[in-house]
Amino acid sequence: MNPYNSLKLLLPALFCFTACKNEEMKLADFTSDGCSLFIDGTFEDPDLWKECCLKHDIAYWQGGTEEEREAADIAFRECVKKKTGNSELAEVMYQAVRQGGEPYYPTWYRWGYGWPIGRGYRALTVAEKDLVKIKLAEYRKSTSINQ
């Protein structure tokens, strides 16, 4: 048996491990467009529920598990309901994000949109959570938003 055969198998595995390890750190800077594909408020108050959308965007940007997405969507619905007093509007917006926010869609508003596409539903590692905190602090500092 040729001793180099084992090395031929080990090197590709090592490169794959290194590439997979680095992927967890590729988090884009946080961005928000308010209520993606929807208005941010009423004619009288154009930013009425925009704060709800910003909080929801923070959750969607960082991504995580399927349970975390569901919790973010429920919190979004409750925020809109509290801001507007309109349960029907809150439910329509909730259903829209439930249907359109899957992590597998190649959109700018998908679950986990801060990470490269294909991440799916995966819990954030400690290092990824730390990176999220850093990126959010940078965003807040640059926009003077204290969410």
What are these regions (language model features)?
Residues 13-19:
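Hydrophobic h-region of N-terminal signal peptides that target proteins for export
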Residues 4-12:
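Sec-dependent signal peptide recognition
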Residues 20-147:
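Extended terminal accessory/targeting regions
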